[in-house]
């Protein structure tokens, strides 16, 4: 049961991250997860590539 809760919470966090915009994204306010630019903050691990 505990593992199920952890998985659900992780999925919710990842889903929220993909719709989160960061001020440091290039271009400005780009969706971090789907961006090919490097974002900072919580979106950084989800950036596809950093230059």
UniProtKB/Swiss-Prot annotation:
Cystine bridges: 25-39, 32-43, 38-50
Main location: secreted
A GO term, aspect molecular function: toxin activity
Keywords: Disulfide bond, Knottin, Neurotoxin, Secreted, Signal, Toxin
Signal peptide positions (record): 1-22
Compartments where located: Secreted
Expression tissues: Expressed by the venom duct.
Assigned GO CC terms: extracellular region
UniProt function note: Probable neurotoxin.
Homology family: Belongs to the conotoxin O1 superfamily.
Entry's free-text remark on domains: The cysteine framework is VI/VII (C-C-CC-C-C).
The protein's name: Conotoxin Cal6.33
Highest classification ranks of the organism: Eukaryota, Metazoa, Spiralia, Lophotrochozoa, Mollusca
């Amino acid at each position: 049961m505990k593992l199920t809760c952890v998985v659900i919470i992780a999925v919710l966090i990842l889903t929220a991250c993909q719709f989160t915009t960061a001020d440091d994204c290039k271009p400005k306010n780009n969706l971090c997860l789907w961006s090919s630019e490097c974002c900072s903050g919580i979106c950084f691990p989800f950036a596809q590539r950093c230059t």
